[in-house]
Amino acid sequence: MEIMIKKRDGHFEPLSVEKTQRMIAFACLGLDSCDPLELEMDAKLQFVDGMTTKEIQKTLVQTAIEKVISKKDDGFGNQVNKMNQDWQFVAARLFLFDLYKEAAITRRYKAFGYGNFPNLVNMLVEEKKYADFFVTEYTADELQELGDYIKPKRDYLFNYEGLKLLADRYLVKGFNKEIFELPQERFMAIAMHLALVEGENKVKYAKKFYDLMSQLKMTTATPTLANAGTPFHQLSSCFISGVDDNLWSIYDVNSKFSRVSKHGGALGIYLGKVRALNSDIRGFKNSSGGVIPWIRLYNDTAVAVDQLGKRKGGATVTLDIWHKDFYEFVELRTNNGDDRRKAHDIFPAISVPNIFMERMLARENFTLFDPHEILAVKGYSLEDYFDTEDEKEFTKRYIECEQDPNLHGIEVPALDMMKKIMRSAVETGTPFIFFRDTVNAANPNKHAGMIYASNLCHEIAQNVGFTNLAEEIINEDGTITTKTNTGDMVTCNLNSISLGRITDEELEENIALQIRMLDNVISINQAPVPESRMTSDKYRAIGLGTSGYHHYLVNHDIQWESDEHIEVADKLFENIAFYAIKASMELAKEKGAYPAFKGSEWETGEYFTRRGYTSDRWKQLAADVAKYGIRNGYLMAVAPTGSTSNIANTTAGIDPIFKKFFIEEKKGSFTPKTAPDLNDKTFWLYKEAHTIDQQWSIKACGVRQRHIDQAQSFNLYITPQMKAKEILDLYVEAYKQGIKTIYYIRNQSLEMDECTSCSS
């Protein structure tokens, strides 16, 4: 019986077997392990009368993707799972075929695939989907040259999951989700935007940036991927603000959070200065509600400002472990206790000083304080100090507070506090851990400030400040001028080297380009709040990270649980650090050092001596940095790269794979997923996260940390079978290895929310 199908324009016609065969042949071209006839026959069984062409296409895609993992007879009568990754690429091409057709309809041309690039740019500028600078800063000839440079065949590098994610979230679309942009055009638009500041060299650099992105050799931050080239180009991932102990500051940060969230960013909030529960207010005792009500305020903002209904806003709140509100705070996301004192959409983080870990290891007591009372009695804020190897200023003042009879501290066993942290972590994955003394001792810009907290994904370590109201002036014309004393508002500009997709020989050149791209983000970014702009200009801080770490190890035949892994990690990240610092120094020669360079550890050379960089190449680089400066005050930070690593078909951040293969169910469809380049050889090299001895992960993290000026989004993976002592040992070893932060404790029985903004 002849099957009638409904075309996109609404009319019916018989299903064309020849067209279907051509489409399948296109999808299977060059993929010898995928039989076009097998796909055609299996898909045909699902075709029914009245199907739309879109449904036909969807059936073909789903049939192909279900072939990635299939049941086969092993020759002994047993049904076993057989994997063929190439079917992911067949499915991607079938989906790509659909994108090409949709784009042709939306863009009103008959060509299949990529059309005239200058025409597209002009149309999207007119439609207010692209920013005007594409036509004001680039000539018609330059647009044509860049359009001719686009390589459509690089679309074939995507697997289905990566292409679908890119299309669903990042390609420019109309208000009704109609496709305007195709994948290579998204990469070129980003490249052209980031190259704008290069003046006469902008076309040259646009091509170089495009090549890196389109060959999946790097990943950009999610906001850059989504917003570059658009009229509002907020390109930064995460922000960090400090809250002072007054209403104006509390609500000012809430306002900043709403503006950051509106444009796809996430916020780290330091709340350690806010007075504790039952503290006094203006001398009235037992008046304060503590930090929890304000955290609930931020929680409500996260839910309300939901990024055009796409997702809730993301925020982490950091509190010092010695704060009297510790016990309520650590259970912020648990299901125990009064729900009116919970904030289930906020991610808590604990700032931990060395003295707490020392007391906990010695099974001694630890004292909780109210920061407001310390300031009133002692005249200083305890949270404004930290320990270094030579000076134990925080410890000295902390003990001084313990010995002061005018302070009403609460003494508790340090181990009991640690048990509370672990119990919450097992149940909720949080709190995140911020080892404050380790972080601040390694801060290259301690001459200019202090690091109080990290961002949502806990890879950023930069100076954090506090903005306060100076005065409000009523002007004669009826307007009001608000003046503030402005503090540093950290802004994270991120991208990542796709380690699984490049060779060691490409590292130096690629890193130089990625550093340039990140520095250009600072110059062109539309910051959501003024303090963000000011802080970005002051430090020109960036975060060069890595994705595809496990992929890289497997490509080099290295087992995760091996001494070779530790040695390779040390060498690899030393090289990354060297090339990154060198690239930033060369940029400083060209464009000038960051304004706060004078007095920094980059200038004094202490940054290099502390890390034991004594080889000739390092000595020369340290001398060059002292002479020419460095363009970026903060350079390296390893983000989790959850979604963007899927686009690049590589592993996320520095994490091991979660599963070698699994089947994901979404909206009734089943999608088999496999580790990158999984085959008979790599199957035995990939070890799944929850089966890995976490001590090896901690060792590797500690080795990498020496070479990273900021931090790493580092997860620990636990199982329900692990004993409390084993989990405690992980925290202790992380501290001893000099790891700066711990992100999630990923319990095998829990699912964690990822921060999409920080994905790079």
Language-model region placement:
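Internal maturation/activation junctions in enzymes
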Residues: 212, 254, 510-533, 541, ...
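Conserved oxyanion/phosphate-binding beta-strand-loop segments in alpha/beta enzyme cores
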Residues: 149-169, 197-230, 258, 691-702
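Catalytic alpha/beta core of large soluble enzyme barrels
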Residues: 132-134, 139-151, 155-165, 456-463, ...
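Gly/Pro-rich turn-and-neighbor structural signature
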Residues: 178-248, 394-424, 428-433, 573-623
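Active-site cavity-forming subdomains of large catalytic enzyme subunits
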Residues: 98-137, 145-153, 236-486, 490-496, ...
